[in-house]
Amino acid sequence: MARIAGVNIPNHQHAEIALTAIYGIGRARAREICEAAGINVSTKMKDVTDAEMDKLRDNVAKFVVEGDLRREVSMNIKRLMDLGCYRGLRHRRGLPVRGQRTRTNARTRKGPRKAVRASSAKAGR
């Protein structure tokens, strides 16, 4: 297995698919990187030579990927939360940020249901 940007790249996959194992690289960017390195996208990673692998590493290094990208995304979210804007408040409360309904659905973001207690229901009457 080759390592690019600190990630083990699977040998049995085509170059285009294998590069998507790196956080921040999707199919389109993987295809772009392969073309820049002069590698056919359907070439299996085990068939890529060392010189071609170096070209791949150089091309991947031009983009913000893995730890740097994760840090950048988390800092953007933290900035929104510090500003106190609507999106930041939604992040802080653990609710959907992009306008989805919350009366029903949104279970992934809200977490498991909280059971209604019988004693608190009687106290509310």
UniProtKB/Swiss-Prot annotation:
Residues 94-116 have a biased composition (Basic residues). The keyword Lyase does not apply. InterPro entries: Rbsml_uS13_C, Ribosomal_uS13, Ribosomal_uS13-like_H2TH, Ribosomal_uS13_bac-type, Ribosomal_uS13_CS. One of its GO terms (biological process) is translation. One of its GO terms (molecular function) is rRNA binding. One of its GO terms (cellular component) is small ribosomal subunit. Residues 94-125 are annotated as: Disordered. PANTHER family: 30S RIBOSOMAL PROTEIN S13/40S RIBOSOMAL PROTEIN S18, SMALL RIBOSOMAL SUBUNIT PROTEIN US13M. Part of the 30S ribosomal subunit. Forms a loose heterodimer with protein S19. Forms two bridges to the 50S subunit in the 70S ribosome. This is Small ribosomal subunit protein uS13. It comes from Nitrosospira multiformis (strain ATCC 25196 / NCIMB 11849 / C 71).
